[in-house]
């Protein structure tokens, strides 16, 4: 079953349209490529400033390796530089155990 890296970003301190454009045209594709993810999706939590990105991996070992990788650290640094550390994020790995 698939495993997902879910990144939630609180964007209330930045321009939402600029953030959305940057994520759409630059960051999502770059992160998918750097992670070697099967897929990358993103969206907004309704009626909020919370942005969610979801990266799909084949198994937990791959996701955990990415979670601890230098590539992720470099993307985090690039992200923080772009947004002057004004966007707080959480990162979780979700291991899907059942599907119908």
Which residues does each PLM region occupy?
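Short, low-order "capping/linker" segments at domain edges
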Residues: 93-100
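Short amphipathic alpha-helical segments
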Residues: 15-39
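Residue-level signal for secondary-structure boundary sites
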Residues: 15, 61-63, 99
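Short, well-ordered beta-strand segments in beta-rich or mixed alpha/beta enzyme
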Residues: 3-10, 40-70
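An amphipathic, aromatic/His-enriched active-site/gating alpha helix that lines ligand/cofactor pockets
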Residues: 34-38, 56-93
């Amino acid at each position: 079953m698939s495993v997902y890296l879910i990144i939630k970003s609180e964007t209330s301190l930045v321009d939402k349209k600029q953030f959305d454009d940057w994520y759409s045209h630059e960051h999502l594709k770059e992160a998918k490529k750097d992670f070697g993810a099967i897929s990358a999706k993103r969206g907004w939590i309704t009626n909020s400033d919370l942005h969610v990105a979801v990266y799909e991996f084949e198994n937990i070992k791959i996701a955990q390796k990415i979670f601890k990788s230098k590539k992720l650290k470099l993307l985090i640094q690039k992200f923080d530089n772009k947004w002057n550390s004004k966007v707080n994020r959480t990162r979780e790995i979700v291991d899907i155990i059942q599907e119908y």
